[in-house]
């Protein structure tokens, strides 16, 4: 890891390494109480399933995501599992690992398997498990595009924080597995992540048969992630502080003093790999960078408008503080972008006008 004043980088060369690094940052597993009960093992071959599996980081399992191909565990995943030493959870019959889709069974660990024929069915199966663990289906659901991974990525962090499942649609409509999952929620709030170019209005009209539908998002992966980070339903009252409160949907982050997780938009598995950082510690939304060497204008403006803390005569020790996580090595997000974000998150003197 590489740290600056206000940022920490999980310096993985790929999402597999990033997932291992994040899991060990959230669960250092070096003292009593610092091991996870359960770890989720998600497939590298199915980014949709990996993003959907992020919801298992929410209560009650709080299971970080590790990644694997179908045949053998990658070395980074195998080593992380050994260090994490999950204890097992009675909520899943003592399982230490939740296997999602086509991943191997880790040797020597008790595992429960979630199966499904394709990404839509697998996401629905993950939703069923989360609902069973929680005692009831969630009141809200996130709908993401199965064909536009960069637009779906921010849903992973929110699922880990909120327990709201991520279900998928195509540009052509709502698959049967997704329809059945929505029916099980009993007319939930349905939040469609992405602009009409990604999920057409015709799909929203189909979704309206299953609940109250609202769209959140913007054109471009970076702007879309910013729109999701700032969103709240019901809307915040103009001129009053905005925050996520019980009964509302969305991060509603429009003030200093928060965490942020920066992801490369071309690495959708990083969204699942980093989801545990949104479901613990700083509880920050995932913001996307579409060029490793440049902080997108949408993210820059968002941080300038809302993130930079100011302090007055009380001094900096009375300020609120931010923290940014940067996911991936310098080929994913450059050191110059990390340094720029570090500066944007730094508390600065604020003029009192006197």
Residue ranges and their predicted role:
Residues 1-354:
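Extracellular glycan-binding segments that recognize GlcNAc-based cell-wall polysaccharides
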């Amino acid at each position: 890891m590489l740290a600056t004043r206000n940022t920490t980088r999980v310096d993985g060369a790929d999402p597999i390494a990033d997932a291992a690094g994040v899991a060990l940052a959230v669960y250092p597993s070096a003292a009593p109480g610092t091991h996870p009960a359960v770890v989720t093992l998600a497939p590298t071959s199915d980014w949709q399933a990996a993003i959907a599996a992020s919801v298992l980081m929410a209560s009650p399992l709080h299971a970080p995501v590790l990644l694997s191909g179908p045949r053998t565990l990658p070395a980074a995943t195998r080593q992380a599992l050994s260090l994490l030493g999950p204890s097992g959870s009675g909520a899943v019959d003592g399982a230490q690992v939740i296997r999602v889709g086509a991943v191997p069974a880790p040797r020597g660990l008790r595992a429960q398997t979630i199966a499904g024929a394709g990404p839509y069915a697998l996401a629905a199966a993950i939703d069923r498990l989360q609902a069973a663990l929680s005692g009831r289906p969630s009141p809200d659901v996130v709908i993401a595009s199965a064909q536009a991974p960069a637009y779906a990525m921010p849903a992973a962090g929110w699922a880990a924080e909120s327990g709201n499942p991520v279900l998928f649609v195509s540009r052509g409509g709502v698959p049967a597995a997704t329809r059945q999952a929505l029916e099980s929620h009993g007319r939930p709030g349905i939040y469609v992540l992405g602009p009409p170019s990604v999920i057409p209005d015709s799909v929203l009209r189909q979704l309206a048969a299953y609940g109250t539908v609202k769209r959140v998002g913007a054109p471009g992966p970076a702007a879309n992630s910013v729109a999701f980070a700032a969103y709240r339903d019901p809307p915040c009252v103009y001129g009053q502080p905005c925050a996520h409160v019980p009964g509302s949907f969305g991060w509603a982050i429009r003030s200093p003093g928060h965490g942020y997780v920066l992801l490369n938009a071309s690495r959708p598995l990083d969204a699942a790999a980093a989801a545990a950082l949104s479901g613990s510690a700083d509880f920050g939304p995932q913001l996307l960078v579409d060029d490793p060497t440049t902080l997108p204008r949408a993210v820059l403006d968002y941080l300038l408008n809302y993130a930079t803390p100011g302090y007055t005569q009380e001094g900096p020790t009375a300020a609120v503080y931010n923290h940014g996580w940067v996911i991936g090595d310098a080929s994913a997000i450059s050191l110059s972008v990390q340094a720029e974000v570090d500066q944007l998150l730094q508390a600065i003197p604020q003029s009192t006008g006197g």
